[in-house]
A protein has these predicted regions:
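PLP-dependent enzyme catalytic core of the Aspartate aminotransferase-like
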Residues: 313-339
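Conserved PLP-dependent catalytic core of the aminotransferase class-I/II
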Residues: 37-45, 240-272, 295
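Conserved N-terminal alpha-helix of the aminotransferase class I/II PLP-enzyme fold
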Residues: 18-63, 67, 82, 86, ...
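N-terminal "arm"/small-domain region of PLP-dependent enzymes with the aminotransferase-like
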Residues: 1-28
Length: 339
């Protein structure tokens, strides 16, 4: 079975070979050597400092929220889909004053709309957004302008890019980005990853497992406060080598090439507006979600259905990982048997 899913992805065999090895003791010099290498390469790929925690993409989001906003602070949420709403759930659990700007399905919210809305708020502390909305295959490519806007408003920008970076590139430093190991970084699930250009600003005590200041302090000694996801990091050691060998820009271009090929072949209507179509995950409208998924399974391919209210009316296809243009063609051929 080959996985063209939004994640976990189809892993290259070389990544799997690295992951299956005996885990190092996390206080050993052998682990520190790999940990140092992975940190250096990830920071080179994204251009910001990185922290690696045990967890998932969701835990990465929660950790970002709890370290960078405080109860009763005003926060704008840009809602472009299901994972935007999950980001909102995390913010609500933090007891912030949440202001939501919602887009139409397949579209994004532009910086001018956010700027106009912000004038209603006296003391805005943060803007929170999803960079690459996995549920709909939508990429918000205004992210750099939104970062500039946040700075001009004396607020910070919190970004969920779990299915985005480094395949869906960001061209400038963002205040905080939450992501994970099992999508475009091409490892297995198990690592919450946070890139940051500003230090945590929480005013209260946090659970030890999500206190980023602990991780920042121990990173200086190439250690983590608690047992890290060792084999995930071993996989990242190989995958980051691969990304840098291919080239950071070329790696993103490869995903765009696969996605463009897919969209040109598939006859169904894409969910995303053309200029906001994600380069890692594509979504298409269909009345035959279950039949398409079952037919592809019989051909040796797994794709995903929609989420929430769209679970039976769209399909989602990921092109991250070990996916060839031939795989894309075969998947499209099956899909095109259905209206």
């Amino acid at each position: 079975m080959k996985y063209l899913t939004p994640g976990p992805i189809q892993l290259p065999k070389d990544v799997l070979n690295h992951i299956k090895n005996q885990p190092y003791f996390h206080r050993s010099s052998e682990f520190k050597e790999i940990f140092s290498s992975v940190i250096e390469k990830m920071e080179k790929i994204v251009g910001e400092e990185v922290l690696i925690l045990p967890g998932t993409g969701t835990f990465s989001i929660d950790t970002m929220v709890y370290n960078y906003v405080n109860p009763n602070e005003d926060v704008i949420l840009i809602d472009i889909g299901e994972f935007s709403r999950r980001l909102g759930e995390s913010l609500i659990s933090r007891n912030v004053k949440l202001h939501i700007i919602k887009s139409e399905i397949g579209d994004v919210v532009t910086p001018d709309i956010i700027e106009d809305y912000s004038k209603k708020i006296n003391d805005l502390k943060a803007i929170a957004m999803v960079h690459n909305e996995t549920s709909l295959g939508v990429a918000n490519r205004y992210i750099e302008k939104i970062q500039d806007l946040a700075k001009s408003l004396n607020a910070i920008l919190l970004v969920d890019s779990v299915s985005g970076i480094p395949a869906e590139r960001i061209s400038k430093n963002i205040d905080v980005i939450a992501t994970a190991s099992h999508k475009a970084f091409m490892s297995i699930p198990g690592a919450s990853i946070i890139f940051y250009s500003i230090k945590p600003r929480n005013f209260d005590k946090l659970p030890p497992s999500m206190n980023l200041n602990k991780f920042i302090d121990m990173k200086k000694r190439l250690e983590t406060p608690y047992t890290p996801p060792i084999n995930v990091i071993m996989g990242l050691d190989y995958s980051t080598n691969y990304i840098l060998k291919v080239g950071i820009d070329k790696y993103a271009e490869i995903h765009k090439e696969r996605t463009d090929y897919l969209r040109n072949l598939v006859k169904l209507k894409p969910v995303a507006k053309e200029k906001f179509g994600s380069n890692t995950v594509s979504a298409f409208y269909t009345n035959n979600t279950k039949a398409i998924i079952e037919s592809l399974k019989n051909k040796g391919y797994t794709i995903a259905s929609g989420m929430g209210n769209l679970s039976n009316s769209i399909i989602r296809i990921g092109v991250m990982g070990d996916v060839s243009l031939d795989d894309v063609k075969k998947v499209a051929e099956v899909i095109n048997n259905y209206d």
